[in-house]
Amino acid sequence: MIELKHINKIYNGFNALNDISLTIKDGEICGIIGQSGAGKSTLVRCINMLEPPTSGDVIVNGRNMVTLSKRELREERKKIGMIFQHFNLLSSRTVYENVAFPLELSNVPQGEQKERINDILELVGLADYRNKYPAQLSGGQKQRVGIARAIVSNPSVLLSDEATSALDPETVKSILQLLKDINKKLGITIVMITHQMEVVQKICTRMAVMSDGKIVEEGTVKQLFEHPKHTVTRRFVQNVEANQTIEELAESLKKKYPSGKLLRLSFTGNNAEQPTIINAARLVPFEISIVESNISQSSVGPMGVTYIHISGGIDSDYNKFVTYLTDNNVIVEVL
């Protein structure tokens, strides 16, 4: 478990982190999302004490990292792997030798090194690339080497600082799937730092949203997708196809449909793929038009948002329509 308690980080009088408290459970994949400058990378570096907090407690696996001696901190850091946007591979070393590097620093016997490295290369899909050099690899393959190097020491925690932001969309999908597999097979707790909501949706079960050095909202991905409260969160939960925030899309729809009612319907899990709107429409006499819709896959199954326009009808019919939707686990928001 990772517990951050009242973390503050001050640089030359500037509060980069402001009274942050967050708990990440064992085996969880937790996303920390925010725009550039929000403080998320500073926060993740506090976890392994690459950036010691100005004040507050960082408790990892029951040990307060802030109070450890230098020797104790070195030992605890071995239990925390980290991957970055830039791969930081040694160009003169092969894939095998790059992965071996942290084991060499820890004086792990050669026989044990070989067994561990071979197992990890198999896990990350690079068994046939062990003798290749970084210059011979694609970006996705280089990141797989970085992941292998980060987990070869059997850490309990893996920190990912924008590890997919420099990759193309298809490679991002494969890297996220690899991280999910690692989490499932090895039970490693993963902390994902990202500015991409799609990354959080695909892999995380919980998320925290950062802005100006603070956590402004946190909860399950499902909760924050269905009920984004803070303005920053609502900006992230955007309609991908229209490339607009919720507020921008709502305003454009209101101008297009000045009369009648506009509803935002949020679906998750099985009901995202059910004909719920069609079934509800059969109960009422008024016209219903789907004016915008998007369904995407997430770590908790499909998630969808549909905007509908209702023309005419009386209140009792409208209430019947909304009641049917809510009874079938659809979140209804009137625009």
Language model region names:
Residues K132-A135, V152-N154:
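Conserved signature/switch motifs of ABC ATPase nucleotide-binding domains
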Residues P169-T171:
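Helix N-cap at the start of a conserved alpha-helix in ABC-type nucleotide-binding domains
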Residues R93-A100:
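Short coil-to-helix segment of the ABC ATPase nucleotide-binding domain corresponding to the Q-loop/switch region
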Residues R63-N64, A100, E104, G111-D128:
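Conserved ABC ATPase "signature" region
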Residues E218-G219, H227:
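ABC ATPase "signature
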Residues M65-G81, L105, Q110-G111, H227-P228:
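ABC ATPase NBD coupling module
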Residues N48:
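Helix-to-loop junction immediately C-terminal to a conserved catalytic motif
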